[in-house]
Amino acid sequence: MSHTQIIGFAGHKQSGKNTACNFILATKLAELGVSKSTRLTDLGEIEVTDILDETVSGQEWMPFKPPHVDVESLFDNELGKFVKIYSFAQKLKQLCVDVLGLDKDFVFGNDQQKNTKTHIKWDNIKSSTKNKGYMTVREILQYVGTDMFRGLDPTIWVNACINQIKKEQPELALVSDVRFENEVKAIQNEGGYVIGLTRSPFKEPKKDHVSETAPAQCLDICDMVIDNASLSIPEQNEQIYLAIKHLNNIPDIIV
């Protein structure tokens, strides 16, 4: 994977990982001429003035994924060779949709959607003694992804993501959900970098599942850590931009 540069972002839930990836993606959209102007909302989501000169009548800004534009095809055919956002949990989430029948919007949605109850009961899991009732989307993702599959092979989701990056070979691959130490090391072993983010909106991360506590250990082996605990989104973006410009092989990708 000689010509693909990987940058991963590590941190707790809602630490700013997705926002960081969106900032870099928005920067590339403007640089590549996909949009004349780009910005991030207060929620860290990308807005653009246009997509390849297509606009929405009466709107100065629109979401980067408007209903009238097939953004996935845009990445498959054009943008994907320059920059693409990946997730270690991508294959897991799609599996839970395809095999367990979970709602795709909830599986790939926000925290409120992930905390929604599903049709699957804790009672179906013979080894579960303390949990009762219906499982939430988040609980299923944690159980299937970590307790089941990582129990069989701790590198299963890492390998799936890295193999996809190698297959698609974008110029810049961004990984938005680094949580475990082996995920950090996998990116570094491919010549990539991992940037840790310190923000932790929840005073006490859940102690009953390793996926909620593992990010704290990740920060110790990241290539650099940005203390974004009290930074606004624009301030975080500035720190990320300055940090990336000092990484080897990155300045040629992010101008």
Regions inferred by a protein language model and the residue ranges of each:
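Short catalytic-loop micro-motif centered on adjacent basic/acidic residues
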Residues: 83, 173-174, 227
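A glycine-rich beta-strand to alpha-helix segment
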Residues: 173-177, 182-183
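A conserved segment at the C-terminal end of the G1
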Residues: 19-32
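ATP-dependent small-molecule kinase phosphotransfer cores
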Residues: 39-170
